[in-house]
Structures are given as structure tokens and as C-alpha cells.
Amino acid sequence: LANLGIKSKALGYTAGFTGDFIKKNLYDEGIESDFVELDGITRINVKINNNSKETEIAGLSPKITKEAEEKLIEKISKLQKDDILILSGSIPGSIERNIYKKLAEMLPEGTKIVLDTRGNLLKENLNGNFLIKPNIAELEEMFETKLSTTADIIKKCAYFLERNVKNVIVSMGGK
């Protein structure tokens, strides 16, 4: 967003030296941040791509306490009409599974939600989102079928539009 000249603020959790690295890089790029600090270190994920296959190794996340969860909810509760909230990734095990729905319900009318997640978490949180962004593998996983043509992909995206999602972007991975 900053590269497009759009002011934004990064919210979430950070911990330890990896959290400091993230905050410094955001600062260097002119992006405001307001993270909730946790004990431990922000997890490191590694992706290995050997042209025909991508392997992901996900590190362990720090524990998110109820107090830390409430601090982040408080920060998000300050969003206003016409703000955009991006909810991305999985939900850590220590946080209620319905947190995305809870956040959506507390936002003022006119706040847009961009949802970038997968599987049941995506299915359970569709109503009224401004944008969702599954990749082709996530779409195939969700519908339990291979999507070989653009027409197949468009047909499956109708499912989201029927659930009041305003925009769907399907990234094609390495294709």
C-alpha cells in the first residue's frame, strides 16, 4: 500500500528479535505500526521452491495471552468507516476460532474487510467481505477439485459472490 502512496498502519503481534526486525523494516519503508508485544520470538516461516514443488516450513508462534488478544481487539476497535482491515492467515490456537467474525461484527458500518485465509476459516467468514484472495491451490482444496481452466475458476468464484463477497482475486501461484 505504501508503494501506491496509500497510508496504512500494521497491527498484530510481534516478539523478540524477529519482531524488532519487522518493525524496523516497516519503519524504514515509512509504514506506521502499532503491534502488541509478546514474549518469545515472532515465528519465522521458510519457503523452499525447487521449480516443480514448493515446501513451507512454519516455525512455532509465541503464545498469545487473553490480555494480548484483548489489546489487539482494542486497537482494531478504533477503526472507522471507510477504513480497510486485512485479516490474513490462520488463527493461533490460543485465540477463539470465531475471532474474524467477532472483529467483523464490532466494526462500524462501511469498514471494508479483506480476507486472506484458507479452508474452513475462509468458508466460515465470507459474508460481506470487500475482498478475498485465495490462491489456486487453496481454491482447489476448498472445492476438492482440480481447476484447469479460467472458466472453471470463474464458476467457483460465483460461490463467493453469492455470499455477498464484493471482490475475489485468485492468485495462480507459479502459473
Model-predicted segments: where are they?
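Short beta-strands and strand-loop turn motifs
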Residues: 56-58, 82-90, 116, 133-138
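Gly/Ser-rich phosphate-binding catalytic loop and adjacent alpha/beta segment
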Residues: 36-44, 65-68
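Conserved phosphate-binding/catalytic loop of the ribokinase/pfkB sugar-kinase fold
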Residues: 48-81
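Short, small-residue-enriched loops and turns at beta-alpha junctions
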Residues: 62-65, 91-95, 121-122, 141
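Short acidic/polar active-site loop segments enriched in Thr and Asp
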Residues: 7, 82-83, 166
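Conserved phosphate/ATP/ADP-binding segment of small-molecule kinases
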Residues: 98-175
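Short beta-strand segments
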Residues: 12-13, 37-38, 47-49, 58, ...
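Substrate-binding N-lobe of the ribokinase-like
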Residues: 1-41
